Structures are given as C-alpha cells and as structure tokens.
C-alpha cells in the first residue's frame, strides 16, 4: 500500500485526510500488480481505523479478482485482550496455532511480571496520552488500558467496566475494562485537566517527526502552563514502533509505562524509540 496524503505537518495531514474522507476519496492505494504477482493465499488487513490503512472494501474487491482467491482476514481489535486473540486467529489461519499460543503465553507472562511493580488499588499519576498534536487527539482503545494497568489514570479518555463486570478492579478485573476510540479535544481541556505526566506518541510519525511536532506544540502560549511541562514529566515516543499498532509490541509499551511512571528504568526494554522532553 502507499499513502495518498502528501501533507507533512500534523495540521495539514488532518485537513487533507478529512477533506478526502468527506469526498469519499481513498487515502491509500494498493499495488494490484505486485499483489497479483505475490499470489497470496491469505491477506491480512485491518478494519479498525480507516485513516491508518487501506479501506477493507478495497482489499476485498481486489482480492476477489486474484486467481488464487485469497482469504482476507480483517482484524479489528478494540482492546489489549483482542490484540492477543488476533494472534491466535492468525496462528490458526496459517497452521501455527501451537506457536501462537506459546507467543501469547510469553506475552501474558511479561505483562504479569511488569504489573508486579504496580499497586492496582492505589491512585496513581494522571497521564494524558496524545496520539496527534494538531488537533490534539487523546489516545483510545488499548492505550488507556495500558496506562491504567501501569498504575496511572487516563482521565481524558478512561476505561469503563464492560457490562456485568462490576467494579472491574485489580489485576484480573482490569481485563474487564475498555475505553472508546481516540478523541479530539481543544487545548483548553488539556490545560484544565493538568495531567501529572504527558506522553506524546503521534500515530504514524517517527520519533524525529514527533520531536518536530512537539516543538511546534511548545510554541503555544498555554504549553508552559501545564504541570507536566513545568515538572519535566513529558515523554515522546515513536507511536508506530510500540504504541499505535495492535501487535506484540504493546507489551513493550506496558513495560515502558511501568518503568517510566515508577522510575524503574531497568524495566524499559532496550532499543525502544522514546526520549524525554525537552
């Protein structure tokens, strides 16, 4: 696939994407010739975010024209648990169910190990996770889950217990909580919330791009009024590397959050693309 968005700044990208979607224009193109040459048996795509990847209907249409008539598997995980379930779905699809189960077990063990450093019943710091900077979008889906399981709060888009889950507290109960989609907020709402810590991991942006995005954001008159800015509790991350994509690296994200929020740097996996700001 190849993006059709040509803008480079967050505001311009958002404007161009909104305009294209309003006119029912695609945001991505698929190399049909290359796909045909590859002759896949299975095509894995996603139906979670129409801005992040090619439209599912387009993939299905093209797949139907291929001689191999590949099976299209569309993933749509809304929660961290659903991300792990999708690993099993893919493992079963390619005849590697045993390996998928082993991978899931390993990932869950890492989650439990990280959470041993967290008191799930104590009120932690409030965190604002920005997955876009202009306009400001607050992270949703699995991101609030990870933040809360790392012992913090995500008040601008918190999780809620699923129906019938009661309070859904504690290490096990928290698996019965989920959040909605990412939400756009005006800067005034961010300022009013005065988060203790701010994590900025723009969707689809590299760490260098995130650095430039935050540099522009920091020129806003309200930026220095934020408590997290004044106390040096702002971190940048390559969102694609370990936050925005629904895959195994979400466990890296949880380990990072526990290490960063609780001042335990040894818990942060080596090689993660993140840095403190400024």
Enumerate the predicted regions with their spans:
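N-terminal ligand-binding lobe of clamshell/alpha-beta domains
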Residues: 1-278
């Amino acid at each position: 696939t190849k993006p059709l968005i040509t803008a480079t700044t967050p505001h311009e990208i958002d404007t161009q994407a909104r305009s294209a979607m309003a006119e029912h224009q695609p945001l991505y193109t698929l190399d049909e010739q290359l796909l045909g040459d590859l002759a896949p048996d299975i095509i894995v795509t996603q139906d979670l975010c129409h801005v992040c990847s090619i439209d599912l209907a387009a993939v299905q249409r093209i797949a139907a024209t291929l001689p191999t008539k590949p099976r299209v598997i569309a993933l749509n995980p809304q929660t961290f648990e659903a991300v792990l379930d999708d690993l099993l779905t893919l493992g079963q699809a390619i005849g590697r169910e045993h390996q998928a189960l082993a991978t899931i077990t390993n990932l869950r063990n890492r989650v439990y190990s990280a959470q041993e450093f967290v008191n799930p019943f104590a009120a932690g710091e409030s965190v604002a996770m920005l997955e876009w900077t202009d306009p400001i979008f607050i992270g949703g889906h699995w991101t609030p889950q990870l933040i809360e399981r790392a012992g913090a709060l995500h008040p601008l888009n918190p999780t809620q217990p699923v129906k019938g889950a009661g309070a859904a507290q504690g290490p096990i109960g928290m698996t019965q909580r989920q959040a909605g989609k990412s939400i756009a907020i005006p800067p005034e709402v961010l300022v009013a919330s005065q988060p203790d810590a701010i994590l900025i991991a723009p969707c689809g942006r590299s760490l260098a791009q995130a650095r430039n995005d935050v540099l522009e954001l920091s020129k806003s008159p309200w930026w220095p009024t934020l408590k997290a800015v004044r106390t040096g509790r702002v971190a940048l991350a390559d969102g694609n590397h370990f936050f925005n994509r629904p895959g195994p690296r979400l466990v890296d994200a949880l380990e990072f959050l526990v290490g960063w929020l609780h001042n335990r740097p040894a818990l942060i996996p080596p090689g993660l693309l993140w840095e403190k700001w400024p």
